């Protein structure tokens, strides 16, 4: 059976092992088609095994993590594509489209898997750049909606929007409003109350 790189040789022992994992050979072929990643923006890992790697083989498959309902389904599938090994020691040889903090060559645990799926859902909802900026300052997504303010060209532009939305400085200062120091105000805002990420998305500090 062809993987992306290398093959799973179907022998009677492999068929028996697949049966233990609740797969038939045709079902595994269908599952490979369903879970194989196109590496086109979906969170993915390239899964091999330490046994094959130590034997000089890069046999493996790019797998779309978002195509699974849960961690157990993912692990079971990974074991199935290496049913020619009695107890495959899974190896994540590369990754794409999720933060490095959840990548582990020695393989991810269930918490990391769930974080990656949540990250993917947040990116679909809010956009990759906004979510990546948020991740610069927060470890989980619990406070995204409360913290997110929007996107601005610069910290000073954000400061201007705060002044325009919250203060009528022309009324209170008259012509002196032309001399208001937006740059200094922005420095104060982002020193204490706000963060701006690399893609110019602003988040309130909570």
Regions found by a protein language model. Give the residues of each.
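Ribonuclease/tRNase effector modules and their secretory precursors
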Residues: 1-40
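Residue-level signature of catalytic and energy-coupling elements of molecular machines
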Residues: 18, 63, 181
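Acidic, proline/glycine-rich low-complexity IDRs
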Residues: 49-52, 159-206
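Structured domain cores in non-transmembrane regions
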Residues: 69-140
